[in-house]
Amino acid sequence: MAKEKFERSKPHVNVGTIGHVDHGKTTLTAALTIVQGKKFGGDSKDYASIDNAPEERERGITISTAHVEYESETRHYAHVDCPGHADYVKNMITGAAQMDGAILVCSAADGPMPQTREHILLSRQVGVPYIVVYLNKADMVDDEELLELVEMEVRELLDTYDFPGDDTPVIMGSALKAIEGDQSEIGEPSIGRLVDALDSYIPEPTRETDKPFLMPVEDIFSIQGRGTVATGRVETGVVKVGEEIEIVGIRPTTTTTVTGVEMFRKLLDQGEAGDNVGILLRGTKREDIERGQVLAHKGTVTPHTKFEAEVYVLSKDEGGRHTPFFQGYRPQFYFRTTDVTGACELPAGTEMVMPGDNVQMTVELINPIAMNEGLRFAIREGGRTVGAGVVAKIID
C-alpha cells in the first residue's frame, strides 16, 4: 500500500509518556510511531533511537528528551519521551515540553510504583490537563482479575491527585507485541485504541490567539506629543486599537486605552500572540509603568504575592548552587521580564533542599506579580539562575 502524503493541515496536539522506570514508556513511544506510521505515513522510530535522546539545554538546565511525531485520523501528535526520571521532573517544571495531555504507562505486571505516583502528582502541580492510561505488559499477566485490580489501583491513584479516575480511558496492551506486529487485542489494535482515546479524550488545545490578551512590558518610551509606548512580545491573545486594557503587577492595577499598535515602525490595527509590538497608551505617563508589569484585557489576570510552587533546583554541574538552602531562603524570582525578591517556606519535615532536588514550596514575594496557575519562573541569585519553577496554586 502506498503511504499517504504526510499532512500538516491537521490540528497539532502535544502529548508525552509518563510513568515509572522500566514500565515501557519508550517501547510504547516506538510502538506509536511504528503502528501509526503504517496507517498514515511518517517516520517510524525504534527503541534505541528514542532511548538515545539528545541532551538539550533549557534555561541552563540539561534535559534529555526524545521528540517523535505521528498522525491519527484527525490529528498530528508531537510526543515527548524522557530517558530518566530526573529528565521528567526538569521537563515538566520548566515547561520545556508543554503537554496538552499525558499518556501514563503502567506495567500491568507490577502495578503502580513510586514514580507512577510522582509523575501523576507532577502532572497535577504543573497543570497537565488530561491523562490517558496505557496498562502495558498485559501479555505477562494471565489472571484477568489481576489486570482489573491494577486498573482499579491506577484509577484510585488518579483520583487521589484530582484527576477523574472513573472517567479516564484505560487501555490494556503490550507495546512490545504491537512493535512485533501482533494482531491480537493486546498487540497492534491496542495502539489503535490508545490513539482513539487521545483523539476523543484530549480536547483540541486553545490556540494562543484565542486566549485573553497579555503582554509583558519589556521597555517604555515617551514619544513627544503622542504619549507613552510600552514594548514587548504579545504572549497570548489579540489587542486592538481603541480597547481598554489594564496595567497589572508590582503597583496597584490601573486602566488605560490603546491608542496605537506599531510593529517595525508601521502602524497596525492590532497585535497578536507572537508579535513584537509597541503599544501606545492614552494618558499614561512614562513613570506610571515599568518593566515586569503586564498589559492585559480587563479582569483576565490579577496580581498576587503568595503561591505554592513546584521547583527544580539546579545541580552544581548545571551551574547551580554548591550548597543546600534552608527555611526562609530569599532569592530573586524572575517572572517574564523582571526579578522580584521572595521568601521560601519549605514543606513540614523538609530541613533543607539540595542542588538537583525538586521540592514543593510556598513563596511570598515582596511585590505582587500578574500571575495565573501554570506560570513558569526562574530562581536567581545575583543574576545567576539557580532553579526553575512553576506556579502550582495561588494562595493570595
Curated annotation (Swiss-Prot):
Region feature (G3): 81-84
EC number from the UniProt entry: 3.6.5.3
Domain (tr-type G): residue spans on this chain: 10-206
Binding residues annotated for Mg(2+), in chain numbering: 26
Record-level Gene Ontology MF annotations: GTP binding; GTPase activity; guanosine tetraphosphate binding; translation elongation factor activity
Function: GTP hydrolase that promotes the GTP-dependent binding of aminoacyl-tRNA to the A-site of ribosomes during protein biosynthesis.
Protein name in UniProt: Elongation factor Tu
Source organism of this protein record: Hydrogenovibrio crunogenus (strain DSM 25203 / XCL-2)
Gene giving rise to this polypeptide: tuf1
